[in-house]
Amino acid sequence: MSPRMVRHAKLLAGGLALASLLSAFAEDPEEERWFSLPFPVSGGARAYFESAYFSSSGTLSYTKPVAEQVAWINADLGDYGYLLADGWLCSALNGQTDHVHRRAFYCFEGTARYGYDLKFTDDIHLDTNGGLLWDWLGGYRAHHGTPLAIYAMQHLRNPILTPYWNLLHRFDDNRYVRIRTGVEHPFSPIESVKIVPYIESIWGDAARYRRVYGDSPSYRFLNGAYMVGVTGFVAEWRFTERWYLWFRFRQFFTVNPAARSLAKQRDTIVHHTDYSIYGLGLGFRF
């Protein structure tokens, strides 16, 4: 086995070890646990690979594979809502960005949020949560820091088409704002399979526009912001009560004409104004 394959296997094993650790919280009706919690707790973890890395801010950061791990935990407070915390790690699997950051675990992102699910009927409810997002950028060679941001998300869940929006606003830079809006429609063709097709837009701020694409006298979209469209789907196949295989396909396209024009003039990763990204992984829920 080559050193690269060994490194990839270690990253995947690390994510699965985290999932196994979280499984200690899983309820087993046949066994009596040595501790108890005052409220129901659920969560999970997933380790996966993607063919490229598309930033949540709406830009293509890599065109080579990356390894990612994510874990989350949710405390159900009953009539008082719920608490949610999650964390995400990313590692590059190639030298495409060695000049920017190290390869293994170069970035961590986590959130701590409070949420409330307002039910209108059994099938229609408004799920809202918000809190703080924290980034650790210690793996970057020239951009060390721990930015803090406001993070909020809302879904109007219903049987037909679920609209949603998501806001990220950094405290250290009032211009650094990202807004995602979209619609999705989860469905299950069979009991063990869940598919969520979606389409969304990502509105980026003027500061990131200039940093990624450069200055242009022609941009007029939202005072210099840019917009990216994303369409795709997420699929899960649950092969045991708790374990599942995960797959994601995304196709992004830069909408703003000024951004498309500037991107095509640059000999960088972001010169791609349209790109397809595939992801495959293994997850666990409790």
Predicted regions: what is each one?
Residues 1-42:
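Cleavable N-terminal export/targeting peptides
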Residues 5-9, 47, 114, 239, ...:
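Positively charged, low-complexity intrinsically disordered regions
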Residues 14-15, 43-44, 81, 87, ...:
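Small side chains
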Residues 26-97, 283-285:
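Short glycine/proline- and aromatic-enriched beta-strand/turn motifs that initiate or cap beta-hairpins
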Residues 38-40, 62-64, 105, 145, ...:
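Short coil/turn motifs at beta-sheet boundaries
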Residues 43, 65-71, 108-112, 146-154, ...:
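Hydrophobic, lipid-facing positions within transmembrane beta-strands of outer-membrane proteins
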Residues 77-79, 155-162, 166-274, 281-286:
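Outer-membrane beta-barrel transmembrane domain signature
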Residues 81-182, 189, 218, 257, ...:
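Outer-membrane pore/translocation modules
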